[in-house]
């Protein structure tokens, strides 16, 4: 049995509950009484239902800087052990789910975990600055069993969209999300990469203090405009505009949340597979490129909406 440790919890992120539940199931009484996320209280009973999704792996330990949070996660996700430190957690497990998306704390909290050599999942992206990203690159390298992802890329909606778009002429793509660019851009970018590849030549953020409006220019002429504003209502997702056809809406947070939950389950299955085989589901180069596109969006906004040419931006990053 593969033993997994989970690290949580930051404000606005319920992944320690939902990711752990894929492996362990959940206690519905504690879920309804103690979980602070209404959507999780809805989709776990409706679409997980305490079925077994992964038979040969369990979350056996949890750590959170706030003891009360760790205890709550443990009760809801049936985790038998609460670690008193990251070191205690990492020593007791075979692999680590780092389920925090306060990206500015990623290196400070998780950097030491890479010394263990154990498989690691990092929520969404690695870093919020080029300096921290370089630290992760130096600590991990292309052969480390590392997965960073949003589950949108693993949603059944993406496979449906691939089939639907196979005979279409795509004109442009629009993406909408709540929250902030550095945290939620990976949701939209991961799905874009699956559908249209990652050959992005320029990034421009024309947003303002209220949010981000980021245009991604593909080498083939495709443009994707991603709008991320805190407080925007659901659904989060992409809309693909086609020549002579109705737009195709691809919802991450679909109306019933069934496909949303299934995307999480599939992502955890692929993490489990990486732990066993050592083979990452996403190439190292793509993991780093996605993070650098996030950084380019930040850089563009800081420079008043300047168009960032990715070739020169990547050269500067590598210097």
Sequence positions of predicted segments:
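N-terminal Rossmann-like dinucleotide-binding module
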Residues: 1-72, 152
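Rossmann-like dinucleotide-binding domain that binds NAD(P)(H)
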Residues: 171-235, 285-292
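Glycine/Thr-rich phosphate-binding loops of Rossmann-like dinucleotide-binding domains
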Residues: 14, 106-107, 156
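C-terminal helix-rich "cap/oligomerization" subdomain common to oxidoreductases
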Residues: 47-50, 88, 92-101, 274-319
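C-terminal substrate-binding/catalytic lobe of Rossmann-fold NAD(P)-dependent oxidoreductases
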Residues: 210-271
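A contiguous active-site-proximal alpha/beta segment in oxidoreductase catalytic domains
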Residues: 121-185
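Glycine-centered short loops/turns at secondary-structure junctions
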Residues: 117, 143, 304-305
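Beta-loop-alpha module in the N-terminal Rossmann-like domain of NAD(P)-dependent dehydrogenases
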Residues: 66-68, 72-138
């Amino acid at each position: 049995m593969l033993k997994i440790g989970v690290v949580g919890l930051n404000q606005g992120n319920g992944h320690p509950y939902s990711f752990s539940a894929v492996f362990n199931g959940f206690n519905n009484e504690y879920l309804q009484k103690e979980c602070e996320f209404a959507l999780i209280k809805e989709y776990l009973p409706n679409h997980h239902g305490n079925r077994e999704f992964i038979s040969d792996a369990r979350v056996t330990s949890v750590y959170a800087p706030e003891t009360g949070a760790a205890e709550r996660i443990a009760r809801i996700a049936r985790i038998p052990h609460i670690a008193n430190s990251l070191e205690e957690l990492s020593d007791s497990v075979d692999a680590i789910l780092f389920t925090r998306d306060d990206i500015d704390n990623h290196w400070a909290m998780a950097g030491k975990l890479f010394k263990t050599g154990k498989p690691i999942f990092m929520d969404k992206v690695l870093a919020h600055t080029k300096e921290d990203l370089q630290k992760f690159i130096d600590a991990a390298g292309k052969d480390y069993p590392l997965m960073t992802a949003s589950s949108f890329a693993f949603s059944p909606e993406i496979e449906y969209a691939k089939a639907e778009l196979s005979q279409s002429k795509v004109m442009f793509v629009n993406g909408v999300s709540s929250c902030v660019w550095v945290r939620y851009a990976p949701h939209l970018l991961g799905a874009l990469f699956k559908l249209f590849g990652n050959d992005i030549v320029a990034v421009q953020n024309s947003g303002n203090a209220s949010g981000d409006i980021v245009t991604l220019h593909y080498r083939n002429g495709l443009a994707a405009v991603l709008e991320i504003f805190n407080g925007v209502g659901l659904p989060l997702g992409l809309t693909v505009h086609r020549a002579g056809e109705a737009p195709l809406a691809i919802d991450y947070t679909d109306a019933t949340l069934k496909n949303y939950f299934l995307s999480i389950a599939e992502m955890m299955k692929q993490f489990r597979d990486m732990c066993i085989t050592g083979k990452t589901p996403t190439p190292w180069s793509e993991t780093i490129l996605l993070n650098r596109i996030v950084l380019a969006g930040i850089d563009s906004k800081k420079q008043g909406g300047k168009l960032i040419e990715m070739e020169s931006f990547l050269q500067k990053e590598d210097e």
